[in-house]
UniProtKB/Swiss-Prot annotation:
The gene is argB. PROSITE patterns: GNAT_NAGS (PS51731). This is Acetylglutamate kinase. Its EC number is 2.7.2.8. GO terms for cellular component: cytoplasm. Substrate binds at A59, G60, R81, N170. It is an enzyme of class 2 (transferase). The record marks K26, K231 as: Transition state stabilizer. In the N-terminal section; belongs to the acetylglutamate kinase family. ArgB subfamily. Residues 253-426 are annotated as: Unknown. PANTHER family: N-ACETYLGLUTAMATE SYNTHASE, N-ACETYLGLUTAMATE SYNTHASE, MITOCHONDRIAL. Keywords: Amino-acid biosynthesis, Arginine biosynthesis, ATP-binding, Cytoplasm, Kinase, Nucleotide-binding, Transferase. Pfam families: AA_kinase (PF00696), NAT (PF04768). Residues 1-252 are annotated as: Acetylglutamate kinase. It comes from Xanthomonas campestris pv. campestris (strain ATCC 33913 / DSM 3586 / NCPPB 528 / LMG 568 / P 25).
Length: 426
């Protein structure tokens, strides 16, 4: 799945969190129905490595089937299911059955799990005349969840709410998840779906979204349809009210471990992210912080005269100095400027966040041609292969490029890389 170093890095990061701040996992009813085995396997694995997720589930398809069988026509207003007293009895039955099905499947898989079908969401009527017995969450009681976590058991929660007087109300599972997340402030919010993530215009998976740099551009795309638009808006609203380190992952149950424990992931990772600073001179940057970023990222020391001897063209640095791209001006060849990628640095604790890609994407938008070199054992080479138009292997280096127009340019850039002096010691 990944290197032992990667897995260990993420496990250490997650293990340092308070138990209830690790992850809230939202499971749709379709996943419970169609992918229960993969779901229980992934959740059990997390428990095996010492992590206990908090699981909240829906039961939409199951509820549709039971209501239809009872002769109750589905009625929605503003996307919310209108719930009559007769329907509520079926809602309770279906939620409890779905909850127990997941809890029993986890227990059969060797995991410890606790069924929590009430006592978490205190609610009031959303609008009784319009929606019937549908609730709006007013308070979240963490006591049942904390008791489960203290016992080392996965809390499995339904989205049923209760009024202070004890009336059960049907609460939309997405709304319940949002309120739970606001109360817990978790490091990870995970939506498990059949699609495994958000898809672009060509049906390809979007691996990461940095909202600070990509949200406005993304929302202008014609292929962002109504459902996806609402989902992205909801995620942004959610993350805007959480700590900067919190993130949303959308993935398949079978890919949950890969999404959590590898830099590459397997789904769509959405973060509020950081703004990307753009500089054209070293004076515009905090050089001690930039030095620390570069040296920490590469595990080596910059040569003492690096900044005085390096002719900066542009630098792109995340606002908290956790990722940076440094470009240098290597003169002209004919009518074309030669731009060299001198450094691409990402701190270990930012690996897997999509922050490096966000900085790279900002750079690439205004850099139509680029060349660079990388050591043969550099783990980033997989990314470089995907981003480049070509690669030539030298004795010590791989030379990458994109946007170069002819063989003369490529030949010149390859020769430059062969003789360029290293700027990192050790």
């Amino acid at each position: 799945m990944a290197s032992a170093k990667e897995i260990s890095q993420y496990l250490k990061r997650f293990s340092q969190l308070d138990a209830k701040r690790f992850a809230v996992v939202k499971v749709g009813g379709a996943v419970l129905r169609d992918d229960l085995e993969a779901l229980t396997s992934s959740l059990s694995f997390l428990q095996e490595v010492g992590l206990t997720p908090i699981v909240l589930h829906g039961a939409g398809p199951q509820l549709d089937a039971e209501l239809s069988a009872a002769g109750i026509e589905k009625q929605t207003v503003n996307g919310l299911r209108v719930t009559s007293p007769h329907a509520l009895a079926i809602v309770r039955k279906v939620f409890q059955a779905s909850n127990l099905k997941l809890v029993e499947a986890l227990q059969q898989n060797g995991a410890r799990a606790t069924s929590i079908t009430g006592g978490v969401f205190e609610a009031e009527y959303l609008n009784r005349d319009t929606y019937g017995l549908v609730g709006e969450v007013k308070a979240v009681n963490l006591a049942p969840i904390e008791a489960s976590l203290q016992a080392g058991s996965i809390p499995v929660i339904t989205s049923l709410g209760e009024t202070p007087s004890g009336q059960i109300l049907n609460v939309n599972a997405d709304f319940a998840a949002n309120e739970l997340v606001q109360e817990l402030q978790p490091y990870k919010i995970i939506f498990l779906t059949g699609t495994g993530g958000l898809l672009d215009a060509e049906g390809k998976l979007i691996d990461s979204i940095n909202l600070s740099t990509e949200y406005d551009h993304l929302m202008q795309q014609p292929w962002i349809n109504g459902g996806m638009r609402v989902k992205i808006e909801q995620i942004k609203d959610l993350l805007d009210r959480l700590p900067l380190e919190s993130s949303v992952s959308i993935t398949r149950p079978a890919d949950l471990a890969k999404e959590l424990f590898t830099h590459k992931g397997s789904g769509t990772l959405v973060r509020r992210g950081e703004r990307v600073l753009r500089a054209t001179s070293w004076d515009e940057l905090d050089l001690p912080r930039l030095t620390s970023l570069i040296e920490s990222s590469f595990g080596r020391t910059l040569v003492p005269d690096y900044f005085s001897n390096t002719k900066l063209l542009r630098a792109y640095v995340s606002e908290n100095y956790r990722a940076a791209v440094i470009l240098t001006d290597e003169g002209m060849l004919g009518a074309s400027a030669l731009i060299y990628l001198d450094k691409f640095a990402v701190l270990d604790d930012a690996q897997g966040e999509g922050l490096g890609r966000a900085v790279w994407n900002v750079m690439r938008e205004e850099t139509p041609q680029l060349f660079w070199r990388s050591r043969h054992n550099n783990q980033v080479n997989i990314f470089y292969y995907a981003e480049s138009d070509g690669c030539i292997k030298q004795e010590k280096w791989k030379v990458f490029w994109y946007g170069l127009e002819n063989f003369e340019q490529i030949q010149h850039c390859v020769a430059h890389c062969a003789t360029r002096q290293p700027t990192l010691l050790g």
